[in-house]
C-alpha cells in the first residue's frame, strides 16, 4: 500500500467536505483508512506522521501505539479537537503524499458525506415549527454540552457510548481489563469510563444522569464489596433501573468479578449476572458480555 508514484494521477478533491465533522465518516471508511495507515513502511507516511500533522504530542502518540487499531483511535481522539473536519483530513493526507489513499477511498468518503448532508437536511425538514419538548439527543443545559473528552463543545454532536461503566475506584484494574477486552479487540465497543472520558468541573450527579439516560445504550455495574458502600454507584444504579422498570430493555448488566464477603445487592438479584468468578463459564465471559452490549 505505497503512496502514488510519479505516474499516478493526483487524487480528485472530494466536494462538500471542508466543514463537515469527522463523524460524517462511517465505520467502513475508517476501517479502510486503518488498513492503509496502520502499516509501518519506509516508503509511505503512516498514522504516526498523520498524528504529528494533527498536532498530537510525542507521549500522546506513544499512548496510541498501545492500541490494536491506532488509526481508529487517532481519528476518535482528533475529531473532538478544534479544526477537525473531513476536509482537513483530506488536506493532511494530500500533504503527506498519500494520494493512493485518496484515490482508493475518495468515492466512499464522498458517499458518506452526501449521506450525512442528506440526513442533516431531512432532520431539519422534520423539525416541528414549535418544539414541544427538548430533543433527547441534545444536552438539556449548556452545562452538559461539553462533558466528555470527545464532546462537541457546542452540544451539536454529543459523544455517545455503547455502555456506561458504574464502578468504584478500587475496581479500576478490572475496568481497565474490560477496556482491553471490549474496546481494543474485534468487538470495537465504546465504553464510558468516568475517570478516562468525563471532563472535570461539572456536578457528578448531573453528568451521570445525562450519560446514562441520553448518551449510553447500556450500563454495566461492577459489583464488589466497595460498590455497596458507594453513594455514587448507588445513585447510578437506581437511576438506570428507573429508566427500565423490570429490566424489560436489558439496560443494566451486573458483573461480579471477584468473591464478595457481603451479600449481593437485592436490587440487582432479579437481573441475570455476568459472573467472572465462575471457572466453568469464565472462558465465555467476554463473548457473552460483548454480545449483550451489542444488542440493539
Curated annotation (Swiss-Prot):
GO cellular component terms given for this protein: cytoplasm; nucleus; plasma membrane
Keyword Lipoprotein: no
Classification via CDD domains: Death_MyD88
GO molecular-function term, one example from the UniProt record: Toll-like receptor binding
Region called Intermediate domain, residue ranges: 110-155
This protein's UniProt keywords: Cytoplasm, Immunity, Inflammatory response, Innate immunity, Nucleus, Phosphoprotein, Ubl conjugation
Residue ranges occupied by any TIR domain in the UniProt entry: 159-293
Modified residues annotated as Phosphoserine in this record: 244
Compartments where found: Cytoplasm; Nucleus
Xref: InterPro entries: DEATH-like_dom_sf, Death_dom, MyD88_Death, Myelin_different_resp_MyD88, TIR_dom, Toll_tir_struct_dom_sf
Post-translational events: Ubiquitinated; undergoes 'Lys-63'-linked polyubiquitination. OTUD4 specifically hydrolyzes 'Lys-63'-linked polyubiquitinated MYD88. Deubiquitinated by USP3 that cleaves 'Lys-63'-linked ubiquitin chains leading to inhibition of MYD88-induced NF-kappa-B signaling.
Disulfide bonds: none
Domain Death: 32-109
Pfam families reported for this sequence: Death, TIR_2
SMART domains from the UniProt entry: DEATH, TIR
Any one biological process term the GO annotation gives: positive regulation of canonical NF-kappaB signal transduction
Origin superkingdom: Eukaryota
Presence of the UniProt keyword Nucleotide-binding in the record: no
The protein's assembly and partners: Homodimer. Also forms heterodimers with TIRAP. Binds to TLR2, TLR4, IRAK1, IRAK2 and IRAK4 via their respective TIR domains. Interacts with IL18R1. Interacts with BMX, IL1RL1, IKBKE and IRF7. Interacts with LRRFIP1 and LRRFIP2; this interaction positively regulates Toll-like receptor (TLR) signaling in response to agonist. Interacts with FLII. LRRFIP1 and LRRFIP2 compete with FLII for MYD88-binding. Interacts with IRF1. Upon IL1B treatment, forms a complex with PELI1, IRAK1, IRAK4 and TRAF6; this complex recruits MAP3K7/TAK1, TAB1 and TAB2 to mediate NF-kappa-B activation.
Free-text note regarding domains: The intermediate domain (ID) is required for the phosphorylation and activation of IRAK.
Role: Adapter protein involved in the Toll-like receptor and IL-1 receptor signaling pathway in the innate immune response. Acts via IRAK1, IRAK2, IRF7 and TRAF6, leading to NF-kappa-B activation, cytokine secretion and the inflammatory response. Increases IL-8 transcription. Involved in IL-18-mediated signaling pathway. Activates IRF1 resulting in its rapid migration into the nucleus to mediate an efficient induction of IFN-beta, NOS2/INOS, and IL12A genes.
Protein name: Myeloid differentiation primary response protein MyD88
Organism annotation: Macaca fascicularis (Crab-eating macaque)
